[in-house]
Regions:
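Non-catalytic, mostly N-terminal accessory regions of nucleic-acid modification and defense proteins
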Residues: 1-108, 166-168, 172-180, 274-277, ...
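Generic detector of ordered secondary-structure context
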Residues: 46, 64, 93, 147, ...
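Conserved S-adenosyl-L-methionine
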Residues: 87-191, 196-214, 226, 246-249, ...
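Signature of N6-adenine DNA methyltransferases within the class I
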Residues: 178-187, 194-372
């Protein structure tokens, strides 16, 4: 045990431990930085103090906690995300957002794919959600890909510590440059791609002949629709479901109208949910949760009888759900509570279910089911505010009363200003300085 190792030998002992992890099997091969402690030149005595403090932690404090190491690992990932820049923080998706996506697509069995898996957080939080719903995470086969080397290693360690079997490919590389799961299609997809990614269209994309699901090549200026079409191509044709986040601009970009029209007319888009601002640590923008579904024909699904809802899209606007600010964080942030996640999912499930009339399914300022004809008249825009009714509260304003009160307040301010002007002039005059 490290606690018994003298300070003078501790650096070597820790590096030996890293080497042992490297040699333990293929799961963590290439994940650890060998000779790390030697290279960073930490003072042996200081390192010994840290080891001694860690050894004071008693597992008894955590009771039956089975995932202590995993929780500690996640804590440090989150701490780094809090202090990271926008680009650095892309590897981490807050747990409440993952829970929302999982609640909508219910990845309880089969295969789960994330084409930009970051540190593996989607998989971890999804596993927790499945277990909380009395599901068996061993029935879910995880597939992912990540282009950043350090983040790829974080993901492998993160999943290994949780005992989650995974397939992340042979190494880090962009999904667009090389699909390491070519030929495979999946039951579920969850993803949080980098928002508005530029410079994604490389010569490798052209040479690989990426499958855009027969929708044509997406704009090179922005990867949003490249992600959409890639994920659509990776869904099982008869039942695949995807839930992913994109910047709000993807809802109505002029240069993607043709692709968006085809997605809508082919009945691939099931729901569009605009989320509150400040859900992320590294950006305060509002983003959208997209739900794609290869089967809107109805039937039994996870114990629910679904109606045929082809020709409809459910729009939801959750931007006002900001009543839960996270206290104690260095950056302003809000989160979605479990009851809010459930409420949003219930709205979605009711809309899908037998007995619901999609033509009238609506609640002002929150959600509305919309048919293709109305989408067509709006040039296939997917911006929820185009369709959800918002109450014009200005109609209830007594403008005469408001303006009268405003005029009275301005008069008082002007009168007070005159009084202050006289007082200031008199004060200066008494000092021998007179204002002209």
């Amino acid at each position: 045990m490290l606690i018994n190792v003298p300070a003078s030998n501790l650096v070597a002992a820790l590096d030996d431990a890293l080497q042992a992890i490297e040699d333990s099997g293929d799961t963590l091969k290439g994940c650890v930085n060998l000779s790390l402690f030697t290279s960073v030149k930490i003072q042996s005595n200081e390192l010994k103090k840290v080891v001694d403090e860690v050894n004071k932690i008693s597992h008894k404090v955590f009771g039956e906690e089975k995932d202590l190491i995993g929780r500690v690992y996640e804590y440090f990932l989150k701490s780094f995300a809090v202090n990271a820049t926008k680009e650095e923080g892309e590897f981490y998706t807050p747990h409440d957002i993952v829970e929302l996506i999982a609640a909508f697509i219910e990845p309880f069995d089969g295969t789960l794919y994330d084409p930009c898996c970051g540190s593996g957080g989607m998989f971890i939080q999804c596993a927790k959600y499945v277990e909380a719903k009395q599901g068996d995470i061993t029935t879910v086969n995880v597939f992912g890909q990540e282009k950043e080397d350090s983040t790829f290693r974080l993901a492998k360690m993160n999943l290994a510590m949780r005992g989650i079997s995974h397939h992340l490919g042979d190494g880090p590389i962009s999904t667009f440059d090389k699909d390491q799961h070519a030929g495979l299609v999946f039951d579920y997809i969850m993803a949080n791609p980098p928002f508005n990614l530029k410079h994604w269209f490389t010569k490798d994309v052209t040479q690989q002949g990426v499958n855009w699901a027969d929708y044509g090549t997406p704009p090179e200026s922005n990867a949003n629709y490249a992600w959409i079409l890639h994920m659509l191509s990776k869904l099982k044709a008869d039942k695949g479901i995807a839930g992913f986040l994109l910047a709000n601009g993807a809802l109505g970009d002029e240069d993607t109208v043709a692709i968006r029209q085809e997605l809508i007319e082919n009945d691939k888009v099931e729901a569009i949910i605009v989320l509150p601002r400040e859900l992320f640590y590294t950006t305060d923008i509002s983003v959208t949760l997209w739900i794609l579904n290869q089967n809107k024909r109805g039937g039994m699904h996870h114990g629910r009888q679904l109606r045929d809802h082809r020709g409809e899209i459910l729009f939801m606007d959750l931007r006002s759900w900001t009543e839960n600010p996270v206290k104690g964080e260095q950056k302003k942030k809000v989160e979605l509570k479990a009851d809010q996640v459930k409420r949003a999912a219930d709205i979605f499930f009711r809309w899908q279910s037998v007995g619901t009339n999609g033509a009238t399914y609506a609640e002002p300022e929150l959600y509305r089911s919309v048919g293709f004809e109305e989408l067509k008249t709006n040039n296939f825009s997917l911006v929820p505010s185009r369709y959800i009714e918002f109450v014009d509260r200005d109609n209830n304003i007594d403008y005469d009363k408001v303006l009268t009160e405003t005029a009275s307040a301005v008069s008082e301010l002007l009168s007070l200003q005159c009084e202050n002007d006289v007082m200031l002039r008199n004060a200066l005059k008494q000092l021998g300085y007179e204002c002209k």
